[in-house]
Amino acid sequence: MMTLADRQPIVVADAGPLIRLAAAGLLGTLRGLNRQIVLVDRVEDEVAGDLAKPFAADIAKWIDDMGPAVLRAQTAVGIGVATLKARQRTPEEDVILKAALRDSGELALREFLDRWRPTDTASAIVVYEDRKVPPLFLAASYPLTLMTTRTFARIIESWGVNIGAVAALEAIADRYDLKPALIAEIDSDLSEDLRPLPGPYDGK
């Protein structure tokens, strides 16, 4: 059972959680968790690379304000995409970039998983909205807890960090698709084919 006193880093696995937390006014709550937040470069670019997008400026400011509490993880995939975006491209490179942008988040996350390990704790929390994320993390070589944004809000409310977190998130559900409250505890000692995909969160 996770507690507020634990210090598992929180991996934001795709753009969905940050956008929804920003829309709900909950970004500031993350500071109260006193944990490192891990953002892969392609996820950061998706949520804050274009400041004209909804909540991008808010998220970019939050990242800067959090300072070293946010681990901005670089990947070869992210560096390659950034290099292509920054230079004048041939028509062929435009096609390559368009294809890369479609799959780059998943590829960068996979690359990141292959080399990253939690440093101060033995496990990690992974928050996601993209259905492609859980299968990637089933192969992790360290224990972790996979959860959707709805579960995350319920947990931080149960810890007393923000007793209005669930209501704030549910208030934006008519504008932003939210996955149900799902969770899975991944035991790295289990064979990969025995590890469960996220199921309903019962609040325990």
Protein language model features and the residues they cover:
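Short beta-strand scaffold positions
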Residues: 13, 127-128
